[in-house]
Amino acid sequence: TLKELGKLEEAVESYKKALNINPDYAEAHNNLGSTLETLTQYTEAVESYKKALNIDPDYAEAHNNLGQAFYLLNLTDKALDSFENALALNPEFVDAYNNMGGMLQDLGRLDEALNCYVSALAIEPDDAEIHRNLSTVKNYKPGDTQFDYMQALLTKNNLNDSDRINLCFALAKAHEDLGNKDDFFKLLNAGNELRRKELNYPIEKNLNIHSLYKDLFISTTNIIPAYEPLTIKP
């Protein structure tokens, strides 16, 4: 699609033309809203999502997207209602659980955020992004089954770099909680190496960072952004 190609303004015009032909095209309203949201036109995105829902009140994806737009406008109560509406319509809507978890975490409601991530993983246990998000609000204990599951996931050969990065950081956090210093630094370094590769970041800027962290061994929440939850997504 034009949006996937990064041609956002052209995508907006394309959706508007489609809606001129068929104003009751709920999916086009939703897609227009998603594109406007990407363009940071959040108020306009809300209006598009609302139009989609006026046509199809049971459109779970539009409820989820509306929740995201409300959250980006700092309308957190409305956002929560929208995420809950999406989940009432589709109790296995992983993105809605993940998005609601991210919002609740940002609001400091960590137990509720943890429950959202756990619910999402119960549906999609191989989702590396959600494993990472859960790791940001969880304190790992010996014998944790999620820890074992993440270790098994990381051995799979078909992981893309993004999934591997998420699992490395999630497992690094788990090893930190468990006091496994060497494994913590090994996985932290592996995740950062992959992320630098993904971002095309000059490696020479980080030649000494691993040894520096190992010497200090202080809480990573104060020195790197690796454990911050990922942003919500449509």
Predicted regions and their residues:
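Non-catalytic membrane-proximal stalk/linker segments that position and tether the catalytic domains
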Residues: K141-N157, N166-K233
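Conserved alpha-helical positions within TPR/SEL1-like repeat arrays
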Residues: T1-E4, E27-T38, E61-L72, D95-Q105, ...
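Generic helix N-cap/helix-start motif at coil->alpha-helix transitions
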Residues: D126-A128, N160-L167
